[in-house]
Structures are given as C-alpha cells and as structure tokens.
C-alpha cells in the first residue's frame, strides 16, 4: 500500500481497509463521520490524492448499499402504463458545494420516503464549476453515505450537447468530444445520459423531417455508442431532445419526425438495443430565465398542454416515459404541481439553487466573487446591461475558481446554506409528488453493483474545454 493511500485512510480514522484495488468498510459509523475529509480531497487535490479519494468513496458506497443506477426501467414502466402518473421526477443540477447541497436533498428525501430523483451536471457546467464527472459523482455518493441513504442513486449527464459552432468547423472532432465525455461519465457512475444534438436542427429547411434529420441521426449514433459501452447488466437511460430551450414550442410533427428518424437509425446501428426513455421539448422557458434590469426575473409562461399532449404521444406511440421540461427553476412555485398534472416525466432545476448559494453566502465573499467577475468575465457584459443583469448572467463563472474558498466557509455558514436548500427541496418534493416514490423505484429498478475501475480514477487530469456556447 502506498504512503498516499495510508494517509487517506488515516483521514477517515482507518474506517476503511485497502488491499490492492479492493476496498472494505471496517466501521460504517466512523467512515460516515469522516467522509467529508475525503470529499475535500476529491474536490481540491489535483493529483492521485483526488483520484484515490473518489475511488475509495465509490467503492465504499457499493458496500454500504448506495448504488449508482439507471432510471430507464421506471420510465419504460410509465410508458407501459404500469408506473403511477402521480409524480414528476426532479433532476437537480447542483453547481456549487454539490456535496453539501446533495446532503440537504437526501435529508429531504428521507423525510418522505422519496427515491425517484436525479442529480445531474451538464457538459457546460463541468467546465465552469470545475467538476469532472468523477468529482461530481463522488459528491453525490458521499452525501448519500453521510445522510444514511440506502438504495439506487440516479446520476445524470445533462445536455451532453453538440456545439453547433464546433460541429460546423470539425464534425468528427466535436462528436468525439461528446463520446469521450460519455465514456468518462459512465466510468464515474453516470448511468443516465441526455444526448443533445438539437443544436443542429435547421428550421430553414422546408419539411419537419428534413429539419430534424441531422438531430435524429446523430442522436442515434451517440445512443448506439453509449449502448456499446454501458456496463454489463445496466441499460443506461438515454434522453433525446427535439429543440433548444427558448423559441417556438415543440409540436407533435416534430416529435414524430425525430422519433421515427431516430428509430430507423437505431435499427441500422444497434438493432434490437433499447432506444430513448424520454424526450425533452420546448414549452416557452429559457435556461436561467430572463433577468430584468433590477435583477428580478421575468415571469415565465409555460405551455403545459404541450407537455401533456407530447407526453401522451411519447408514451402511447413510442413507449417512452414522457416529456422532459428544461429551465424550470424560474417557473412560479405555485405552478410546479402542474408538471405532475400534465404528465411530464422529468423536470430540470438548476438556477434557483445557485441563486440561493449567492443569497446565503457572507456578503464579503460574494463581493470578492463579483469583483473577480468584473475582471475575468468582462466580455459577458453587453451594452445596456445593468450591474444586476451582468452579475446574474456571469456569476456561474466564479463557482469553479472559488471552489476552495466555498469549502472553507465557516461551519455555521455551511449549515445556514444547507438549511435553506433543504427547505426548498422539501417544498419542491411535495409539489412534484415525491412522497413514497422509493417504493416505486424499488418495484421497477434493478440495481447492479458495477465495480469501479481504479484506472478511471488515478490517471492524468483531463483539461477543461471552452463551453461558453453550450446549454446548462
């Protein structure tokens, strides 16, 4: 055993043992108490210390019944009419202090026996939050261990998106970047991946099938690639998307054109293999919302009937779980139960939890982050922008550079932030029908203990990429 590993075991009071690549939990209570030290090593170290910390947590999680899982079977059960229509699965993008936020989420879940919820991170967020997939998954699994949660944990790659600009410059290089990210994520325990090639939809073409052609073909190519690399016994939940967030609402002809084209391509590339479990559609939202001059957000009007009508087509015609709503953090809370009423299978939430981070951190720390943005994100300041609009749009860029200082916040400040997040999770879980969904998860989800590969964790660091044109 290397000195490095011995030192890491000391940080958790020797509650784990390591022989070669085999990890055993010797004292679960002691490990739970000290796991936060490994989390900090995972997040802040830049060498093999980070890799080993992640590997130890992933391995211990399996032994403690915290199992990365795919939600595919549950979604297909909804498509068959076997799973109840009483809930919409929330998918949370935890950008800042992900471990602390996930702990709050697991606390909320345990109060009401919830199990059907997802932790996700987008390709763009991996860049500006400074969290590679293995680090993000480590934060989530460690949070589950800390809070005594047992069962399937759904970790998702959100918007594994093709950059239209980069694709036009070099199609194969851009596709390979998403393939590589998929491989990296699967190795880290991401068994749910949202493939997003909707950036390549061309609405200037004369017919809907022509507009969606490149989207469905590339979605199928990436899906076939994921199927080829998914672990034995695991069917990764793959989501597709028929349009980027923002402009015109999605239509049934678009959904049918995309799915029909996708299914034709999948038969060629991966005959007999499962396809999509869900589909993301446009209903009038935008990522992050529209910020007004005073820093407040414009009210969002969602076409809930689009979610309902297209969910029904997705289930009845294509066997999927239904439609997915992106950019929902800025939707009025009183409307959240409408996602359930209108049969959405999944809803994505990110911005509000980042807003709560900035609203709850000490004023001096926030001022320091904003001063950094003045210098390092000056290019994001558009003519006519107020300070409030600029900071709202640019502040996410400070999360990665200030990660270490975020971890170093006093315990009282971290507790205050955790309590605020927990109260919000409580509210959203109630509105989205999460009570007793652990029973539904246990009924339909098959868990497979996929042993992590040490070589996926202890290797050269992956350089960050320019993701400024990608969606969150």
Which role fits each region the language model picked out?
Residues 98, 121-125, 159-163, 197-201, ...:
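Active-site-proximal loop/turn and secondary-structure-junction residues that shape catalytic pockets
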Residues 1-157, 163-166, 170-174, 180, ...:
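Alpha/beta catalytic barrel-like cores
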């Amino acid at each position: 055993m290397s000195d490095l590993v011995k030192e890491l075991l000391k940080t958790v009071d020797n509650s784990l043992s390591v022989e070669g690549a085999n990890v055993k939990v010797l004292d679960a209570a002691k490990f739970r108490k000290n796991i936060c030290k490994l989390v900090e090593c995972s997040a802040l170290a830049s060498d093999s210390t980070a890799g080993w910390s992640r590997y130890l947590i992933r391995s211990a999680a399996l032994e403690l019944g915290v199992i990365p899982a795919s939600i595919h079977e549950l979604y297909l059960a909804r498509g068959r009419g076997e799973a109840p229509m009483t809930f919409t699965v929330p998918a949370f993008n935890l950008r800042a202090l992900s471990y602390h936020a996930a702990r709050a989420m697991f606390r909320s879940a345990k109060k009401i026996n919830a199990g059907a919820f997802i932790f996700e991170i987008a390709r763009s967020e991996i860049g500006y939050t400074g969290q590679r997939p293995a680090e993000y998954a480590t934060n989530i699994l460690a949070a589950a261990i800390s809070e005594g949660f047992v069962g399937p944990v759904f970790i998702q790659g959100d918007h594994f998106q093709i950059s239209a600009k980069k694709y036009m410059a070099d199609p194969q290089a851009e596709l390979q970047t998403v393939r590589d990210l998929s491989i990296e994520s699967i190795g880290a325990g991401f068994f749910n991946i949202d493939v997003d090639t909707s950036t390549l939809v061309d609405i200037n073409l004369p017919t809907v099938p022509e507009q969606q052609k490149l989207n469905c073909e590339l979605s199928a190519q990436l899906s076939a690639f994921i199927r080829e690399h998914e672990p034995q016994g695991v069917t990764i939940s793959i989501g597709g998307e028929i349009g980027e967030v923002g402009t015109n609402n999605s239509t049934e002809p678009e959904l049918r054109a995309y799915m029909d084209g996708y299914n034709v391509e999948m038969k060629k590339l991966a005959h007999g293999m499962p396809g999509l479990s869900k589909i993301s559609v446009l209903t009038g939202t935008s990522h992050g919302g529209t910020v007004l001059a005073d820093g407040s957000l414009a009210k969002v009007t969602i076409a809930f009937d689009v979610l309902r009508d297209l969910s029904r087509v997705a289930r009845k015609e294509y066997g999927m779980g239904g439609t997915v709503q992106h950019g929902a953090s800025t939707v009025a809370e009183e409307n959240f139960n409408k996602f359930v009423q209108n049969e959405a299978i999944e809803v994505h939430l990110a911005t509000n939890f980042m807003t709560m981070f900035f609203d709850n951190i000490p004023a001096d720390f926030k001022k320091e982050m904003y001063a950094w943005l003045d210098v390092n994100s000056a290019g994001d300041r558009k003519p006519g922008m107020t300070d409030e609009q600029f900071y709202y749009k640019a502040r996410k860029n400070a999360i990665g550079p200030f990660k270490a200082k975020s971890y170093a916040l006093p315990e009282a400040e971290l507790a205050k932030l955790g309590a605020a997040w927990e109260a919000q999770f409580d509210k959203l879980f109630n509105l989205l029908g999460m009570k007793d969904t652990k029973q539904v998860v246990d009924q339909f989800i098959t868990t497979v203990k996929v042993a992590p590969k040490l070589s996926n964790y202890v290797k050269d660091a992956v350089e960050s990429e320019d993701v400024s044109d990608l969606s969150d």
